[in-house]
């Protein structure tokens, strides 16, 4: 016997259908008369989403940032190179920029002087009409100027005079005055570069290696860009692993430094007697550079200690050498941390922990060869970011970082124009203060 099949309640079904239809008609009525733009714009919104995805995946499609590079008087660029050489030249533009750890100013300048067809993958495009520019680049060789001044005392060259002259020239420019320099980009790689005039250029996006010599109202992670030193030794191209690396740890540099660099002398005393640790004094010279290359290429770990400032080119030499950096520098700032996680190829040690007898070598001896190999593989992937000669290296990444500042630049320009000037006795800066909790994440 078949069970009885219940017939649907037709009146209930009709009521549900009528209710759904009524809600739909009300929705259409409201959106048609009160929110018509939703429908008219939906196609463009959808297209914009597709366009943005395509731009993200295909770099050639996005709008490049337009950068105007000032045609500075030659005494701020090639004239500084001429002063470094000490001999007059009929054509200063033919002079070669001398090699040193702050060559970023040269690479950025030369990048903008290259034909556009050779700047493949760059997020910026150079424009020659300042009215078209999103940003303005000031190409003064401020770090080289310091070298010339300190290297030839009594020669008659003054870096401070160069700084004053540069800023006076800038302040006479219409485009600088328009927004108080906020849409300008200035490289000041050496910690003392532009120190005398920093208060007059602090509104600009500063390209710096650290913030150690800058006040909180002069430099910040929000406004400025941390850039890498130019590494001085050849990259390691040999076999990965520890087979060719007979030293546990390597360091070569000045033993005695001021302020935060005092940790060097203490660590020298702790480490110099360890049998497979190479730690010795040395200043910059061709002979010592060869010794550094040999030491870094044959060591598993390379020690990075704070000097007069927390940063140094030694870290980037280590990465180029695939020598695992051991960083003992509590306040160090590192470049490009939005795309690079340094913990994946570096070991960070707190200063107080590193100064405990036996702590450093004991910790490093526990790192297995397989772990070192993983560190090396990551370094090999990321080291292009620290190579100014790489087609998609430091230069492109610096421009990308600068481009990301544009929304903040526009915000600050508009905000400044409508706000009453505040009392200068309480300076404020749009500053990102990292790790406000005070929690220490190093070992």
Curated annotation (Swiss-Prot):
Residues passing through the membrane, by range: 16-36
Topological region Cytoplasmic: 1-15
Entry GO MF terms: glycosyltransferase activity
Gene Ontology cellular-component annotations: Golgi apparatus; Golgi membrane
Topology term for the membrane: Single-pass type II membrane protein
Enzyme class: transferase
Cell location: Golgi apparatus membrane
UniProt xrefs under InterPro entries: Exostosin (IPR004263), Exostosin_GT47 (IPR040911)
Main localization (coarse): Golgi
GO aspect biological process, one term: cell wall organization
Functional description taken from the UniProt entry: Probable arabinosyl transferase responsible for the polymerization of arabinose into the arabinan of arabinogalactan. May function as inverting enzyme using UDP-beta-L-arabinopyranoside. Cell wall pectic arabinans are involved in thigmomorphogenesis response of inflorescence stems to mechanical stress.
Subunit structure: Homodimer and heterodimer with ARAD1.
Name of the protein this chain belongs to: Probable arabinosyltransferase ARAD2
């Amino acid at each position: 016997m078949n069970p009885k099949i219940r017939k649907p309640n037709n009146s209930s079904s009709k009521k549900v259908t009528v209710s759904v239809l009524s809600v739909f008609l009300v929705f259409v009525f409201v959106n048609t008369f009160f929110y018509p733009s939703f429908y008219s714009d939906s196609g463009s919104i959808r297209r914009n989403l597709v366009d943005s995805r395509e731009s993200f995946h295909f770099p050639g499609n996005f709008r490049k940032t337009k950068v105007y590079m000032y045609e500075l008087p030659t005494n701020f660029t090639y004239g500084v190179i001429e002063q470094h050489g000490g001999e007059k030249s009929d054509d200063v533009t033919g002079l070669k920029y001398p090699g040193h750890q702050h060559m970023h100013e040269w690479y950025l300048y030369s990048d903008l002087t290259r034909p556009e067809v050779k700047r493949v993958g760059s997020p910026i495009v150079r424009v020659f009409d300042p009215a078209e520019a999103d940003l303005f680049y000031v190409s003064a060789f401020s770090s080289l100027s310091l070298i010339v001044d300190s290297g030839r005392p009594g020669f008659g060259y003054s870096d401070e005079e160069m700084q004053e002259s540069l800023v006076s020239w800038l302040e006479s420019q219409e485009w600088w005055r328009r927004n108080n320099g906020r849409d300008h980009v200035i490289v000041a790689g050496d910690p003392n570069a532009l120190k005398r005039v920093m208060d007059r250029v602090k509104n600009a996006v500063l390209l710096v290696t650290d913030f150690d010599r800058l006040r909180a109202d002069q430099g910040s992670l929000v406004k400025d860009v941390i850039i890498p030193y130019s590494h001085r030794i050849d990259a390691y191209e040999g076999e990965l692993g520890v087979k060719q690396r007979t030293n546990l740890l390597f360091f070569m540099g000045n033993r005695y430094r001021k302020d935060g660099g005092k940790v060097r002398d203490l660590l020298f005393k702790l480490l110099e007697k360890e049998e497979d640790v190479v730690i010795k004094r040395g200043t910059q010279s061709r002979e010592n550079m060869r010794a550094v290359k040999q030491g870094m290429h044959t060591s598993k770990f390379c020690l990075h200690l704070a000097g007069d400032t927390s940063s140094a080119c030694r870290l980037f030499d280590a990465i180029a050498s695939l020598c695992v950096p051991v960083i003992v520098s509590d306040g160090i700032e590192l470049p490009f941390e939005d795309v690079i996680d340094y913990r994946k190829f570096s070991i960070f040690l707190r200063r107080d922990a590193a100064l405990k007898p036996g702590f450093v070598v004991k910790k490093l001896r526990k790192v297995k060869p397989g772990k070192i190999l993983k560190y090396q593989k990551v370094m090999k992937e990321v080291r292009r970011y620290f190579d100014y000669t790489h087609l998609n290296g430091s230069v492109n990444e610096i421009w990308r970082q600068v481009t990301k500042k544009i929304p903040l630049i526009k915000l600050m320009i508009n905000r400044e124009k409508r706000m009453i000037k505040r009392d200068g006795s309480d300076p404020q800066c749009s500053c990102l203060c990292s790790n406000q909790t005070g929690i220490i994440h190093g070992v």
